[in-house]
């Protein structure tokens, strides 16, 4: 494990606790959420779109009420900048979980520690504690115990074709589709479900994602029987490219769309909107983090949630980029190849411009995959 990661990833973990935990408490956000949660639980019946205690189980209803308070301003459009940041967030951190799932499926990670790589396990931790709090520690331990991280080879990095094809289905049906449904305006979805129902179901996305993957894998395994084994390498490479390509496309679309809306509102068409909306959608409001050590306070759930999402994304994406860089370097070391750091820096900047740090991370791991597969292919031909 490279020395840089030994220190950098734990620093990200500590930064997550400070910027998401301590900062949220100090700026008054936690107290506001608790007050709003109690107001939700005490809400009188009558509104069919808001049920105060949907399950009747006190502890569960309290947890759900906190989630409703958190997500309501994200989805109802009352804070345009927050809604835009959430769309940008969906095109970043959840896609990082796809990369983590990919690592969990590799042959070298199927051991007595396989439970550690479970995307369902880490997904539920992320739901309860935010992604940025959990991801740095997962990545640190992964680099310490995973053979695919320290000694990447075609053998230990291999993934069955059915698993790869199931992951493609999972990305579309288990991740992208639920995210789109929860982000749609209630005027569109109200005939199917209320916003409260959508939030509740979306919180269980790690289970839906796992179920989709399991069903798709079983179906695909049955259809793959009797397939021509001579074309196996080509089909596996094609499946890998589909996984990385879909993930990169989702990251790029979210990044370009959200930045385009923000820049258009701030500089191209500011007169077409109210001054309040223009200010809310300004890049400095949406994408520039509020430093957690400044003596600032918030008086609304929307503003506090925006600050939390900004730091959740910053820490989570930053940590996974360092992780991907170490995997990228390990692959080059294993193949005795040198990295042209000048070209690498230019390439990273270019990918960040069109797809953010998530897109740059995907590109690094994609290049690593291609390198190991080509080396393994060449080795097979010499036998």
UniProtKB/Swiss-Prot annotation:
Entry keyword Transmembrane helix: yes
Major location category of this protein: membrane
Positions annotated with a glycan in the UniProt record: 109, 156
Record-listed E.C. numbers: 5.4.99.-
Cell compartment(s), UniProt: Membrane
Bilayer topology: Multi-pass membrane protein
Record flagged with keyword Glycoprotein: yes
UniProt keyword terms in alphabetical order: Glycoprotein, Isomerase, Membrane, Transmembrane, Transmembrane helix
GO cellular component terms given for this protein: membrane
Pathway in which this enzyme or protein is active: Polyketide biosynthesis
GO terms for MF: isomerase activity
Enzyme class per UniProt: isomerase
Domain of life of the source: Eukaryota
Membrane-traversing stretches: 5-25, 79-99, 121-141, 164-184, 243-263, 342-362
Family named by the database record: Belongs to the membrane-bound ascI terpene cyclase family.
Function: Epoxide hydrolase; part of the gene cluster that mediates the biosynthesis of aurovertins, fungal polyketides that exhibit potent inhibition of adenosine triphosphate synthase.
Name the UniProt record assigns to this protein: Terpene cyclase aurD
UniProt source species: Calcarisporium arbuscula
Organism placement in taxonomy: Eukaryota, Fungi, Dikarya, Ascomycota, Pezizomycotina
Gene for this chain: aurD
């Amino acid at each position: 494990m490279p020395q840089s990661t030994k220190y950098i990833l734990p620093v990200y973990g500590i930064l997550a606790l400070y910027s998401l935990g301590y900062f949220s408490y100090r700026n008054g956000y936690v107290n506001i959420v608790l007050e709003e949660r109690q107001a939700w639980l005490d809400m009188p019946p009558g509104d069919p779109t808001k049920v105060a205690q949907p399950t009747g189980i006190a502890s569960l209803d309290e947890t759900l009420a906190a989630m409703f308070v958190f997500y309501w301003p994200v989805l109802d459009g009352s804070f345009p900048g927050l809604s835009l940041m959430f769309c940008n967030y969906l095109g970043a951190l959840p896609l990082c979980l796809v990369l983590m799932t990919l690592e969990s499926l590799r042959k070298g990670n199927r051991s007595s520690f396989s439970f550690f790589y479970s995307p369902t396990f880490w997904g539920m931790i992320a739901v309860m504690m935010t992604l940025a709090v959990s991801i740095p520690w997962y990545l640190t331990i992964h680099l310490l115990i995973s053979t695919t991280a320290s000694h990447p080879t075609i053998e230990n990095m291999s993934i069955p074709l059915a698993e790869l094809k199931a992951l493609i289905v999972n990305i579309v049906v288990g991740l992208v589709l639920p995210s789109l449904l929860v982000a749609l305006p209630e005027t569109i979805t109200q005939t199917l479900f209320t916003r409260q129902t959508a939030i509740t179901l979306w919180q269980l996305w790690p289970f839906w994602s796992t179920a989709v993957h399991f069903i798709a894998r079983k179906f695909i395994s049955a259809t793959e029987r009797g397939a021509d084994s001579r074309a196996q390498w080509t089909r596996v490479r094609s499946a890998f490219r589909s996984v990385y390509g879909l993930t990169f496309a989702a990251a790029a679309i979210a990044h370009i769309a959200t930045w385009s809306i923000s820049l258009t509102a701030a500089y191209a068409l500011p007169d077409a909107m109210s001054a309040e909306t223009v200010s809310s959608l300004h890049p400095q409001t949406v994408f520039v983090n509020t430093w957690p050590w400044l003596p600032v306070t918030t008086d609304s759930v929307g503003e506090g949630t925006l600050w939390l999402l900004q730091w959740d994304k910053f820490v989570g994406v930053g940590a996974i980029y360092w992780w991907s860089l170490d995997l990228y370097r390990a692959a080059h070391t294993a193949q005795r190849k040198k990295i042209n750091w000048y070209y690498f820096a230019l390439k990273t900047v270019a990918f960040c411009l069109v797809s953010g740090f998530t897109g740059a991370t995907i590109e690094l791991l994609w290049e690593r995959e291609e390198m190991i597969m080509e080396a393994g292919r060449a080795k097979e031909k010499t036998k």
